[in-house]
């Protein structure tokens, strides 16, 4: 449990809290500088770069020693994390001999002592290993999505090219890590699916088939509405990381311009009176500009076998977004972009308003417009489906939760217990703040519920959770 806030009086007024922070992040390969005097060659990327050379070498050497030492006890899975009073180090070996290390400062509480001096207390137990190990794995997955594997860079241009790619990517990416708001959802890395009735789903399926037929170069398609996934032709693991990029980086960057010009179609004078709200989120900004650049980001998928490099076209109309992925060897011209815009724009606009209408009807019928009665997180390991009423809208910089961090920590602790047990189980915890926290693990699914009935007993809590399962998950089997 987290340390309780200071009591009333001067102590409380003078207590300052500092969240966890990234101290350093580096990538090294011990094979690249095996002899004395060559140690610097091992370091492929180091943040912050201002750190003196000898200190970088010393820190990497220490990590090597820790990995070697732990390998004695666990040859296949050496070091995962190292706990110290002030910080915690996380280790990941995503490819053979390539090590990524992330050092996170523990949260701090600073108090004033009676003689006016600042007393610093490090909250050593606050960070959850599983959460930050998952964040470190995400760093690699996101790099791989846009650059391919470390080995691919070595094949393309040796260590020099790998260093350039790492510098270019991580220099920007590390600024987007908001370690203070990482939690259980980072462990799951799941996908939020949009709830749809059968008819609307068939309309979307039919739209995708038509688009793939009209634009024959399209290899894979993904369809999202309201930042939630409806359809994807990609493998699950590739989609989960692309989904994270879209929902935490690309879409939030385009929200502001959208709000500014929401009420006017992009081109109202379409033939046949079809309105057209479509626009590119990646690629050309203005299709009428003959000088417009048709550059799209490239992504790498199926890196374990076929290793495909693709152009990523993200096109949006109102709240619907469609991703078209095209082989990177296919040249994309301004004419192609105009053709895509004229085919996809009007149809996607109509489809987006159909989905919106149907969604609002379903919302009225189910009465789901009201504040959710239960605060819960659900995750299905089989299809990566994730649902949370605890997390409010993610902003580009932070994921907002509607519950106290202490309760989020308990959820993480329950998840760690689930990981250690193979069989299905249920854990019920009464928090210091009188909330009840329930975790259920059943048949590859996990459900976490927070209840605020302070005077309830175990039997009543169990009944409430059953009620939640019946209303929210009526078609899902949870063991009692």
Curated annotation (Swiss-Prot):
Belongs to the CCZ1 family. GO terms for biological process: vesicle-mediated transport. Keywords: Acetylation, Guanine-nucleotide releasing factor, Lysosome, Membrane, Phosphoprotein. Interacts with MON1A. Found in a complex with RMC1, CCZ1 MON1A and MON1B. It comes from Mus musculus. One of its GO terms (cellular component) is lysosomal membrane. It is found in: Lysosome membrane. Pfam families: Intu_longin_1, Intu_longin_2, Intu_longin_3. The modification Phosphoserine is found at residues 74, 264. The keyword Phosphoprotein applies. The modification N-acetylalanine is found at residue 2. The gene is Ccz1. The keyword Membrane applies. InterPro entries: Ccz1, CCZ1/INTU/HSP4_longin_1, CCZ1/INTU/HSP4_longin_3, CCZ1/INTU_longin_2. This is Vacuolar fusion protein CCZ1 homolog.
